[in-house]
Amino acid sequence: EIASCLVGSEMCIRDRDNVLYKNNHFENYTSLGLNPHYRLENDDWKIRIGALVDMAFGFGKKFRAAPDVAVEYNFSDSYILYAQAKGGRLQNDFRRLETFCPYGQVSSQPDATYEQINAAIGFKASPAIGLWLNLYGGYQNLKDDLFFQPADLESAANEYSPMLSIGQWNTSNIYAGAEIRYGYKNIFSFSATGVYRNWDAKDDSQSNAGAYALVYKPAFEADLHIDVHPVSALLLNLGYRHISREKVEGNKVDAVNNLYAGGNYEFFKGISVYARIDNLLNQDYQYYWGYPTEGINFTGGVSFKF
Protein backbone atom coordinates (compact mmCIF):
# COMPACT_ATOMS: atom_id res chain seq x y z
CA GLU A 1 0.00 0.00 0.00
CA ILE A 2 1.38 3.41 -1.03
CA ALA A 3 0.41 6.46 0.98
CA SER A 4 0.09 9.80 -0.78
CA CYS A 5 0.55 13.25 0.69
CA LEU A 6 0.02 16.76 -0.67
CA VAL A 7 1.59 19.77 1.02
CA GLY A 8 1.40 23.33 -0.22
CA SER A 9 0.99 26.99 0.64
CA GLU A 10 -0.47 29.82 -1.41
CA MET A 11 -1.05 33.56 -1.30
CA CYS A 12 -3.87 34.34 -3.71
CA ILE A 13 -6.17 37.24 -4.50
CA ARG A 14 -9.64 35.92 -3.64
CA ASP A 15 -11.61 38.77 -5.19
CA ARG A 16 -11.32 42.39 -6.26
CA ASP A 17 -14.22 44.78 -6.84
CA ASN A 18 -14.17 48.26 -8.35
CA VAL A 19 -17.57 49.91 -7.79
CA LEU A 20 -18.47 53.22 -9.44
CA TYR A 21 -21.78 54.98 -8.75
CA LYS A 22 -23.53 57.74 -10.70
CA ASN A 23 -25.53 58.54 -7.55
CA ASN A 24 -23.87 61.45 -5.71
CA HIS A 25 -25.05 60.04 -2.36
CA PHE A 26 -22.92 56.91 -2.81
CA GLU A 27 -19.13 56.83 -2.73
CA ASN A 28 -17.03 54.88 -5.22
CA TYR A 29 -14.79 52.23 -3.69
CA THR A 30 -12.38 49.40 -4.37
CA SER A 31 -12.24 46.25 -2.26
CA LEU A 32 -9.52 43.61 -2.28
CA GLY A 33 -9.62 40.16 -0.71
CA LEU A 34 -6.50 38.09 0.00
CA ASN A 35 -6.43 34.43 1.04
CA PRO A 36 -3.05 33.19 2.31
CA HIS A 37 -3.31 29.53 3.33
CA TYR A 38 -1.44 26.28 3.89
CA ARG A 39 -2.73 22.84 2.86
CA LEU A 40 -1.85 19.32 3.93
CA GLU A 41 -3.61 16.27 2.46
CA ASN A 42 -3.00 12.54 2.78
CA ASP A 43 -5.14 9.41 2.75
CA ASP A 44 -6.77 10.19 6.12
CA TRP A 45 -6.40 13.92 6.69
CA LYS A 46 -7.27 17.12 4.84
CA ILE A 47 -6.03 20.24 6.62
CA ARG A 48 -6.28 23.85 5.50
CA ILE A 49 -5.01 26.70 7.68
CA GLY A 50 -5.35 30.24 6.42
CA ALA A 51 -6.96 33.63 6.72
CA LEU A 52 -9.31 35.83 4.72
CA VAL A 53 -7.97 39.38 4.61
CA ASP A 54 -10.30 42.07 3.25
CA MET A 55 -9.32 45.66 2.53
CA ALA A 56 -11.46 48.57 1.32
CA PHE A 57 -10.36 51.83 -0.31
CA GLY A 58 -12.66 54.83 -0.73
CA PHE A 59 -15.57 53.63 1.41
CA GLY A 60 -16.14 51.12 4.19
CA LYS A 61 -14.06 49.68 6.97
CA LYS A 62 -10.46 49.66 5.76
CA PHE A 63 -9.26 46.33 7.11
CA ARG A 64 -11.00 43.16 8.25
CA ALA A 65 -9.83 39.59 8.73
CA ALA A 66 -11.50 36.24 9.30
CA PRO A 67 -10.26 32.65 9.64
CA ASP A 68 -10.07 30.15 6.78
CA VAL A 69 -9.51 26.87 8.59
CA ALA A 70 -10.83 23.41 7.72
CA VAL A 71 -9.91 19.95 9.02
CA GLU A 72 -11.31 16.61 7.80
CA TYR A 73 -10.46 13.17 9.16
CA ASN A 74 -11.58 10.15 7.17
CA PHE A 75 -11.43 7.45 9.84
CA SER A 76 -13.23 4.82 7.76
CA ASP A 77 -14.59 4.42 4.25
CA SER A 78 -17.27 7.10 3.80
CA TYR A 79 -17.17 8.24 7.45
CA ILE A 80 -15.75 11.72 8.02
CA LEU A 81 -15.29 13.96 11.05
CA TYR A 82 -14.76 17.62 10.23
CA ALA A 83 -14.30 21.04 11.79
CA GLN A 84 -14.08 24.42 10.14
CA ALA A 85 -13.90 28.14 10.84
CA LYS A 86 -14.75 30.39 7.90
CA GLY A 87 -15.82 33.97 7.29
CA GLY A 88 -15.39 36.85 4.89
CA ARG A 89 -16.98 39.87 3.26
CA LEU A 90 -20.49 40.01 1.77
CA GLN A 91 -20.60 43.05 -0.49
CA ASN A 92 -23.85 44.99 -0.07
CA ASP A 93 -24.13 46.27 -3.63
CA PHE A 94 -27.48 46.88 -5.32
CA ARG A 95 -27.64 43.28 -6.53
CA ARG A 96 -27.42 41.87 -3.00
CA LEU A 97 -29.84 44.47 -1.63
CA GLU A 98 -32.36 43.52 -4.32
CA THR A 99 -31.98 39.85 -3.44
CA PHE A 100 -32.27 40.54 0.28
CA CYS A 101 -35.44 42.65 -0.01
CA PRO A 102 -36.77 43.85 -3.38
CA TYR A 103 -39.10 46.34 -1.62
CA GLY A 104 -36.53 47.85 0.75
CA GLN A 105 -34.84 51.24 0.54
CA VAL A 106 -31.61 52.52 2.09
CA SER A 107 -31.22 56.01 3.52
CA SER A 108 -27.41 55.89 3.38
CA GLN A 109 -24.78 53.77 1.68
CA PRO A 110 -24.49 50.42 3.52
CA ASP A 111 -21.10 49.01 4.40
CA ALA A 112 -20.31 45.39 3.58
CA THR A 113 -21.67 42.72 5.90
CA TYR A 114 -18.77 40.81 7.42
CA GLU A 115 -18.99 37.24 8.60
CA GLN A 116 -16.46 37.48 11.41
CA ILE A 117 -16.59 33.76 12.03
CA ASN A 118 -18.69 30.76 11.09
CA ALA A 119 -17.29 27.85 13.08
CA ALA A 120 -18.76 24.35 12.93
CA ILE A 121 -18.02 20.73 13.78
CA GLY A 122 -19.78 17.83 12.13
CA PHE A 123 -19.95 14.22 11.04
CA LYS A 124 -20.63 12.89 7.53
CA ALA A 125 -21.46 9.29 6.73
CA SER A 126 -22.48 7.17 3.77
CA PRO A 127 -23.70 3.87 5.26
CA ALA A 128 -25.17 2.68 1.94
CA ILE A 129 -24.66 3.34 -1.76
CA GLY A 130 -26.31 6.62 -2.73
CA LEU A 131 -27.09 7.61 0.88
CA TRP A 132 -25.36 10.49 2.70
CA LEU A 133 -25.91 11.85 6.22
CA ASN A 134 -24.52 15.06 7.69
CA LEU A 135 -24.85 16.19 11.33
CA TYR A 136 -23.34 19.50 12.41
CA GLY A 137 -23.44 22.37 14.87
CA GLY A 138 -21.71 25.71 15.17
CA TYR A 139 -21.61 29.44 15.84
CA GLN A 140 -21.89 32.39 13.43
CA ASN A 141 -21.10 36.06 14.05
CA LEU A 142 -22.11 38.76 11.53
CA LYS A 143 -20.99 42.39 11.64
CA ASP A 144 -23.31 44.93 9.95
CA ASP A 145 -25.89 42.26 9.14
CA LEU A 146 -28.80 43.44 6.97
CA PHE A 147 -32.36 43.70 8.28
CA PHE A 148 -35.53 45.53 7.26
CA GLN A 149 -38.17 47.37 9.29
CA PRO A 150 -41.28 49.46 8.56
CA ALA A 151 -40.72 53.20 8.30
CA ASP A 152 -42.29 56.35 6.86
CA LEU A 153 -40.88 58.14 3.81
CA GLU A 154 -41.31 61.93 3.94
CA SER A 155 -41.87 63.66 0.61
CA ALA A 156 -41.06 67.26 -0.34
CA ALA A 157 -44.69 68.14 0.42
CA ASN A 158 -44.30 66.85 4.00
CA GLU A 159 -46.47 63.84 3.21
CA TYR A 160 -45.60 60.44 4.64
CA SER A 161 -45.73 57.11 2.83
CA PRO A 162 -45.09 53.69 4.41
CA MET A 163 -41.93 51.91 3.27
CA LEU A 164 -39.45 49.21 4.25
CA SER A 165 -36.15 50.62 5.41
CA ILE A 166 -33.00 48.47 5.17
CA GLY A 167 -30.64 48.85 8.13
CA GLN A 168 -27.61 47.09 9.61
CA TRP A 169 -26.87 45.57 13.02
CA ASN A 170 -24.46 43.09 14.55
CA THR A 171 -26.03 39.65 15.03
CA SER A 172 -24.91 36.18 16.07
CA ASN A 173 -26.44 32.73 16.31
CA ILE A 174 -25.76 29.23 17.59
CA TYR A 175 -27.02 26.54 15.22
CA ALA A 176 -27.43 22.78 14.88
CA GLY A 177 -28.56 20.93 11.79
CA ALA A 178 -28.92 17.65 9.94
CA GLU A 179 -29.07 16.67 6.28
CA ILE A 180 -29.90 13.44 4.50
CA ARG A 181 -29.56 12.79 0.76
CA TYR A 182 -30.34 9.72 -1.31
CA GLY A 183 -30.06 9.11 -5.04
CA TYR A 184 -30.79 6.06 -7.18
CA LYS A 185 -29.38 5.75 -10.72
CA ASN A 186 -30.44 9.23 -11.85
CA ILE A 187 -34.05 8.03 -11.57
CA PHE A 188 -34.95 9.11 -8.06
CA SER A 189 -33.39 11.51 -5.57
CA PHE A 190 -34.47 12.71 -2.14
CA SER A 191 -33.05 15.33 0.22
CA ALA A 192 -34.13 16.60 3.64
CA THR A 193 -32.46 19.29 5.72
CA GLY A 194 -33.25 20.93 9.04
CA VAL A 195 -31.44 23.73 10.88
CA TYR A 196 -32.24 25.23 14.29
CA ARG A 197 -30.80 28.65 15.21
CA ASN A 198 -30.79 30.69 18.41
CA TRP A 199 -30.19 34.34 17.50
CA ASP A 200 -28.87 37.27 19.52
CA ALA A 201 -28.46 40.98 18.76
CA LYS A 202 -27.19 42.99 21.70
CA ASP A 203 -28.87 46.40 21.82
CA ASP A 204 -28.29 49.08 24.47
CA SER A 205 -29.79 51.86 22.35
CA GLN A 206 -33.24 53.41 22.50
CA SER A 207 -34.02 52.71 18.83
CA ASN A 208 -34.89 49.03 19.41
CA ALA A 209 -32.98 48.23 16.21
CA GLY A 210 -31.64 45.01 17.71
CA ALA A 211 -35.17 43.66 18.09
CA TYR A 212 -36.10 44.64 14.54
CA ALA A 213 -32.94 42.92 13.29
CA LEU A 214 -34.21 39.56 14.61
CA VAL A 215 -37.92 39.67 13.70
CA TYR A 216 -37.53 37.86 10.36
CA LYS A 217 -34.53 35.73 11.30
CA PRO A 218 -35.15 31.97 10.86
CA ALA A 219 -35.36 30.06 14.14
CA PHE A 220 -35.96 26.74 12.36
CA GLU A 221 -35.70 25.87 8.67
CA ALA A 222 -36.70 22.59 7.05
CA ASP A 223 -36.55 21.57 3.40
CA LEU A 224 -37.81 18.38 1.77
CA HIS A 225 -37.31 17.77 -1.94
CA ILE A 226 -37.97 14.81 -4.26
CA ASP A 227 -36.94 14.51 -7.92
CA VAL A 228 -38.20 11.74 -10.19
CA HIS A 229 -37.09 10.96 -13.76
CA PRO A 230 -39.78 8.55 -15.10
CA VAL A 231 -38.12 8.95 -18.53
CA SER A 232 -34.88 10.71 -19.37
CA ALA A 233 -36.58 13.78 -20.88
CA LEU A 234 -39.05 14.33 -18.03
CA LEU A 235 -38.26 15.59 -14.54
CA LEU A 236 -40.96 15.80 -11.86
CA ASN A 237 -40.38 17.29 -8.42
CA LEU A 238 -42.23 17.78 -5.16
CA GLY A 239 -41.03 19.77 -2.18
CA TYR A 240 -41.89 21.47 1.08
CA ARG A 241 -40.20 24.45 2.76
CA HIS A 242 -40.84 25.54 6.35
CA ILE A 243 -39.37 28.59 8.09
CA SER A 244 -40.36 29.50 11.64
CA ARG A 245 -39.19 32.92 12.85
CA GLU A 246 -37.32 34.06 15.93
CA LYS A 247 -39.51 35.04 18.88
CA VAL A 248 -38.96 38.73 19.71
CA GLU A 249 -40.53 40.35 22.78
CA GLY A 250 -43.00 37.47 23.05
CA ASN A 251 -44.20 37.61 19.43
CA LYS A 252 -43.37 35.68 16.26
CA VAL A 253 -44.06 36.30 12.58
CA ASP A 254 -46.19 33.57 10.98
CA ALA A 255 -44.14 30.64 9.71
CA VAL A 256 -43.55 29.98 6.01
CA ASN A 257 -45.24 26.75 4.86
CA ASN A 258 -44.71 26.28 1.14
CA LEU A 259 -45.71 22.98 -0.47
CA TYR A 260 -44.76 23.08 -4.15
CA ALA A 261 -44.63 20.83 -7.21
CA GLY A 262 -43.11 21.22 -10.64
CA GLY A 263 -41.91 19.58 -13.79
CA ASN A 264 -39.57 20.01 -16.73
CA TYR A 265 -39.81 18.31 -20.13
CA GLU A 266 -37.05 18.52 -22.76
CA PHE A 267 -38.71 17.90 -26.12
CA PHE A 268 -35.63 18.92 -28.18
CA LYS A 269 -31.99 19.04 -27.15
CA GLY A 270 -31.53 22.32 -25.28
CA ILE A 271 -35.23 23.26 -25.48
CA SER A 272 -37.60 22.43 -22.65
CA VAL A 273 -40.85 23.57 -21.08
CA TYR A 274 -41.29 23.90 -17.34
CA ALA A 275 -44.01 24.60 -14.80
CA ARG A 276 -44.20 25.07 -11.04
CA ILE A 277 -47.07 25.49 -8.57
CA ASP A 278 -46.31 27.13 -5.21
CA ASN A 279 -48.22 27.38 -1.92
CA LEU A 280 -50.40 24.36 -2.64
CA LEU A 281 -51.71 24.56 0.95
CA ASN A 282 -52.88 28.13 0.28
CA GLN A 283 -51.23 29.38 3.49
CA ASP A 284 -50.97 33.01 4.62
CA TYR A 285 -47.37 34.05 5.36
CA GLN A 286 -44.80 36.73 4.50
CA TYR A 287 -41.21 36.74 3.33
CA TYR A 288 -41.06 40.55 3.66
CA TRP A 289 -42.66 42.79 6.27
CA GLY A 290 -46.10 43.94 5.08
CA TYR A 291 -46.04 42.00 1.80
CA PRO A 292 -48.27 38.89 2.02
CA THR A 293 -47.31 35.98 -0.20
CA GLU A 294 -49.70 34.94 -2.96
CA GLY A 295 -52.01 32.00 -2.37
CA ILE A 296 -51.81 29.08 -4.78
CA ASN A 297 -49.81 30.41 -7.73
CA PHE A 298 -48.46 29.03 -10.98
CA THR A 299 -45.48 29.85 -13.20
CA GLY A 300 -44.40 28.26 -16.46
CA GLY A 301 -42.29 28.91 -19.50
CA VAL A 302 -39.86 27.72 -22.12
CA SER A 303 -36.13 27.28 -21.49
CA PHE A 304 -33.38 27.46 -24.13
CA LYS A 305 -29.83 26.20 -23.53
CA PHE A 306 -27.06 27.09 -25.96
Label each region the model flagged:
Residues E1-G8, C12-I13:
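Single conserved hydrophobic/aromatic residue that forms the stacking wall/gate
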Residues E1-S4, P36-Y38, F123, P127, ...:
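Hydrophobic, Leu/Ile/Phe/Ala-enriched alpha-helical segments that form helix-helix packing faces
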Residues E10, D17, H25-A56, I187, ...:
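Surface-exposed extracellular loop regions of Gram-negative outer-membrane beta-barrel proteins
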Residues I13, K46-R48, D54, G58, ...:
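Exposed, low-structure sequence patches enriched in small/polar residues
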Residues D15-S31, F63-E72:
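Helix-rich catalytic cores of soluble enzyme domains
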